[in-house]
Amino acid sequence: MQEVISYIQKAVLEISNALKFPDTGYSQNQNFTGDTQLKFDVLSDEIITKTLSQCSSIKAIISEEKDEILTLNEKANFIVAYDPLDGSSLMDVNFAIGSIFAIYEEKASAKNLRAALYSMYGARLELVICKDQPKLYRLNANNEFIFIKDLKMNEKGKINATGGTQKFWEEKHAKFIKSLFDEGYRLRYSGAMVSDINQILLKGGGIFSYPATQDAPNGKLRAFFEVFPLAFIIEKAGGKTTNGKNHSLLELEFDKIHATTPCFFGSEYEISKLLKAYNE
């Protein structure tokens, strides 16, 4: 698996370099779920596909920007699912964005998830790699990823990052969010899931939520590329995840590679509070 991780590092570095002088315009294409693709979405996907295709340990890749699974080496063991550029719609305002990767063994399923990674393209290039414990790495002047620290969640945080159009929230979710603000939680929501999860992780706690809404009853975020890898990282850091019913997002199973789900990531206190609010 280390070989797979090393090729992901190469792809992340190439994307970071390309971001220095990006074309932030839209292409004429849409991805599988109907999102109009930015030209840099397409370029990032091409970079990752090209790079991972050189890795003999990868059986197949699944991309948010591809309709179907792409088989690379049927004799290999690992399947890599990825969001090539999470938060790409924020490129024009120069917010931090990132790439998300999940490494599955043999079959894309939460129970087969063996490692997860995400990169942050911000003021500096950082990479979180998680097998047993999420570890933060930072690119140095020699183009090497240097270990910074292990990431751990506190039992309770102060950050509230909540997505979905507010007028379409269910009443129970609106009440839950209000209760957090009544406790003094701070709103920290950028519109890039990877950036918001990263802030919660590095600050030690809080909650990220993207609930079921009237206009998206099955949620909006994609299980295999976004939800599962970030849930894996949060839980390995000591946090909790749920869809509002289950006690872990990693309990969920889906047949379709572009399946979506409501999702909540956070410290133990916030997730326990949410489950109570959702199931009273």
From Swiss-Prot:
Q: Which domain of life is it from?
A: Bacteria
Q: Quote one Gene Ontology molecular function term.
A: magnesium ion binding
Q: Where are the transmembrane segments?
A: none
**Keyword presence, Repeat:** no
Q: Name one GO cellular component term.
A: cytosol
The cofactor note from the UniProt entry for this protein is: Binds 2 magnesium ions per subunit.
Subcellular location(s): the record lists: Cytoplasm
The pathway is: Carbohydrate biosynthesis; gluconeogenesis
Q: Which residues bind Mg(2+) 1?
A: E64, D83, L85
Q: Does the keyword Hydrolase apply?
A: yes
List positions binding Mg(2+) 2. Answer: D83, D86, E226
- Give the matching InterPro entries: FBPase_C_dom (IPR044015), FBPase_class-1 (IPR000146), FBPase_N (IPR033391), FBPtase (IPR028343), SBPase (IPR023079)
Names of required cofactors: Mg(2+)
Q: What protein family does this chain belong to?
A: Belongs to the FBPase class 1 family.
Q: What is this protein called?
A: Fructose-1,6-bisphosphatase class 1
